[in-house]
Amino acid sequence: MRFTPGVVAVGGLRISELVGLTWAQVIRRDSGEAQLEVVGKGDKVRQVLIPAVIAARLFASRGDAPASAPVFESVRNPGHALTDRAVNFIVKAAARRAGVNPAASVHWLRHAHASHAIDNGAPITLVSATLGHADLKTTSVYAHARPGESSGRYLKTK
């Protein structure tokens, strides 16, 4: 498949998880979403959902690739996964074309995933599980207090 930074952005994957992903780890759900069985740090497996619109691109690109094939195959080295370097090059090029942060990387997209999910109301525990963090403190780095906001707004008062 042609690599798409969208998978990283919506999945919050680490680069090692991305380049190690095989078709055996991509499961089509009835909803049209893709469920990724991601092998993270310490060989811990977690499930990450990819929205249907991006999942459709994934499934359409598979062709007759066997379950053991990398999802993101190298064009220069068929049968092998993209390298970390190639993935970050693609992310930087896409960021340049989109006019966003020229320092973009897979880690930057992972950070953006966490920050935007939390800002849009996702529970920090869910974000932590999605990212594969063993400690909630790690995820809390991505939670930013916004000017003009106060936790008092979330308390029930009479």
Language-model regions, residue ranges each:
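Basic, Lys/Arg- and aromatic-enriched nucleic-acid-binding interface segment
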Residues: 1-15, 19, 44, 64
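Short alpha-helical segment immediately N-terminal to, or the first helix within
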Residues: 7-8, 21, 116-117, 130
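Short coil/turn motifs that cap or connect alpha-helices
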Residues: 14, 22-24, 101, 123, ...
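Conserved tyrosine-mediated DNA breakage-rejoining catalytic core shared by Y-recombinases
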Residues: 16, 20-58
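Catalytic-site neighborhood detector that most strongly recognizes the C-terminal catalytic loop/helix
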Residues: 42, 131-156
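Short, basic (Lys/Arg/His-rich) helix/loop patches that form interaction surfaces
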Residues: 48, 67, 88-129, 144
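Active-site/catalytic core of tyrosine-dependent DNA strand-transfer enzymes
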Residues: 51-101
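Ser/Thr-centric signal marking residues that sit
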Residues: 83, 105, 115, 138-139
